[in-house]
């Protein structure tokens, strides 16, 4: 299940950049399609993350913090795409998104079921 989870968030990150770029270049139809596919990947990420949480959690704060950071990351991804679609500025959101994404990945790698890079 860990591989499904990692694959789904990697694909979701790619789709965020594709959707963002398509909305920026004015290709609304392609952007709408990729955005809907991205939303399906949000659901997959949440379901696989919840399954990992229930199966492997020692019910401590690190797992709960990782889950909270993951949900915030998904929220920021959606906010980036929507604000770009509406033509609003996204500078501050990009900074917050990158910070939360890095924290989420680092915490995920630190937990026992993550890949042990450090």
From Swiss-Prot:
Signal peptide: none annotated. It is a multi-pass membrane protein. The chain crosses the membrane at residues 4-24, 33-53, 62-82, 93-113. It comes from the Bacteria. One of its GO terms (cellular component) is plasma membrane. The keyword Phosphoprotein does not apply. Keywords: Cell membrane, Membrane, Transmembrane, Transmembrane helix. InterPro entries: UPF0344 (IPR010899). It is found in: Cell membrane. Belongs to the UPF0344 family. HAMAP family: UPF0344. This is UPF0344 protein RBAM_010920.
């Amino acid at each position: 299940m860990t591989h499904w989870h990692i694959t789904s968030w990697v694909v979701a990150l790619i789709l965020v950049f594709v959707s963002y770029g398509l909305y920026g270049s004015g290709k609304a139809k392609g952007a709408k399609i990729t955005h809907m596919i991205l939303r399906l990947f949000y659901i997959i990420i949440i379901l696989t993350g919840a399954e990992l949480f229930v199966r492997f959690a020692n019910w401590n704060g690190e797992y709960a913090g990782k889950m909270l950071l993951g949900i915030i990351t998904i929220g920021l991804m959606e906010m980036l795409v929507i604000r770009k679609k509406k033509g609003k500025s996204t500078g501050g959101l990009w900074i917050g998104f990158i910070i939360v994404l890095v924290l989420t990945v680092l915490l995920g790698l630190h937990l026992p079921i993550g890949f042990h890079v450090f």
